[in-house]
């Protein structure tokens, strides 16, 4: 099954309620809740809404936003990287139960030999961003960075090298702490095992078969004008539109894409690894990626503490952390990215919902994008009739 356009009734949804969702999004754009919104709602493989509202850049002279505008995916990049790793697992080239150090011998330090590849994808490796960042800053002042491999980006190589010998925060497998560096390690494993750059591997095995023709780890210069511009004081406003950001193939957050392309990626998971006649993953691999691997393990996320986390392989599972909507099933997969992007896939309702926007804050400092994401997702699910 491929995504196709159709009426809400074809998908068992209400036309009136879908129109309500579209009016809601348009009102948010018109009242400058956020500068820009591109949204997709699909059910049973049928796109019932694909909307663009707002402007392509801040300011009164900006042109209207187009549905094919490129947005930085930020952390939505992570499940793409995890999918690449699972493809290597299926090819018999990678084992998730092997130590990270088996594939990256430079990954050293007390207890580091106990960190397993699958723990990079559930954020239970025992690493934490704070410790890695502080260690890297101190190390950079003391050492010379060795040259990167021919097929390795210098910026990614530098980040990896500086963190290879960072100390663990906790023993592996004892607590979840969201760690982008762990997914950078996963991307490096994909590079070393496949012999390709992460982007090249994803292009061959994910983007091309999924017809994700507008998805890039390195945005071509000819397409820079299609990338959303955001106010400088918005989250990522001074970074996401720079040539450095658009050419930095970070496994944890470097991809750029359109809302429609990411909806295709989500539909592949609902199709148990298929898209049209193309198989990207086997059904067992999809099942492994989308089940909770860390029951009974607690989680810290910023200032929040959760007694029990719920995480697949780079896919957060709805379970008891309902911050992207109130009506999804407990099996829903919810992945957001810094700056204002979100995809939610609900296998129970057979839905894919994507909202790409520009994260902003109100005058009193409150984030006004997160409520929009929540409300959009609620209104979309509420359109289901049968």
Question: What annotation goes with each model-predicted range?
Answer:
Residues 331, 336-345:
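Short glycine-rich, acidic/polar surface loops and turns
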Residues 95-110:
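Short, glycine/proline-biased beta-turn/loop segments that scaffold the active-site neighborhood
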Residues 19-25, 39, 45, 71-98, ...:
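Active-site SXXK
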Residues 6-73, 95, 239-241, 381:
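Short, conserved catalytic-motif segment at the N-terminal edge
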Residues 14, 78, 258:
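Short, conserved phosphate/pyrophosphate- and ester-handling motifs at nucleotide-, phospho-/glycolipid
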Residues 271, 290-301, 362-386:
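Short, gly/Ser/Thr-rich active-site loops of penicillin-recognizing serine hydrolases
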């Amino acid at each position: 099954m491929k995504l196709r356009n159709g009426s809400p009734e074809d998908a068992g949804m209400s036309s009136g309620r879908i129109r309500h969702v579209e009016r809601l999004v348009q009102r948010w754009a018109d009242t400058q809740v956020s500068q820009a919104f591109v949204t997709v709602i699909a059910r049973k493989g049928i796109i019932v809404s694909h909307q663009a509202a707002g402007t392509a850049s801040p300011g009164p002279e900006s042109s209207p936003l187009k549905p094919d505008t490129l947005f930085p995916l930020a952390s939505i990049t992570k499940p793409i990287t995890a999918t690449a790793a699972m493809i290597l697992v299926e090819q018999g080239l990678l084992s998730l139960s092997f130590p990270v150090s088996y594939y990256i011998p430079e990954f050293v330090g007390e207890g580091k030999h106990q960190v397993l590849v699958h723990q990079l994808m559930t954020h239970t490796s025992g690493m934490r961003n704070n410790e890695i960042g502080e260690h890297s800053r101190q190390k950079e002042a003391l050492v010379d960075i060795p040259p990167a491999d021919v097929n390795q980006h210098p910026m990614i190589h530098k980040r990896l090298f500086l963190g290879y010998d960072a100390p663990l925060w906790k023993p592996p497998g004892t607590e979840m702490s969201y760690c982008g560096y762990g997914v950078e390690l996963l991307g490096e494993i994909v590079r070393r095992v496949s012999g390709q750059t992460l982007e090249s591997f994803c292009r061959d095995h994910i983007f091309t078969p999924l017809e994700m023709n507008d998805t890039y780890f390195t945005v071509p210069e000819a397409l820079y004008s299609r990338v959303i511009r955001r106010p400088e004081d918005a989250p990522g406003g001074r970074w996401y539109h720079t040539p450095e950001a658009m050419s930095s193939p970070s496994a944890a957050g470097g991809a750029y894409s359109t809302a429609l392309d990411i909806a295709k990626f989500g539909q592949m998971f609902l199709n148990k690894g298929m898209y049209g006649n193309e198989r990207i993953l086997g059904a067992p691999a999809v099942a492994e990626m989308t089940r909770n691997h860390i029951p009974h393990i607690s989680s810290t996320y910023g200032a929040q503490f959760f007694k029990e986390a719920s995480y697949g392989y780079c896919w957060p599972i709805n379970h008891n952390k309902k911050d992207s909507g109130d009506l999804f099933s407990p099996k829903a997969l919810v992945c957001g990215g810094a700056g204002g992007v979100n995809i939610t896939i609900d296998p129970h309702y057979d839905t894919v919902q994507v909202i790409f926007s520009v994260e902003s804050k109100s005058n009193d400092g409150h984030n006004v994008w997160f409520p929009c994401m929540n409300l959009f997702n609620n209104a979309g699910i509420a359109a289901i009739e049968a």
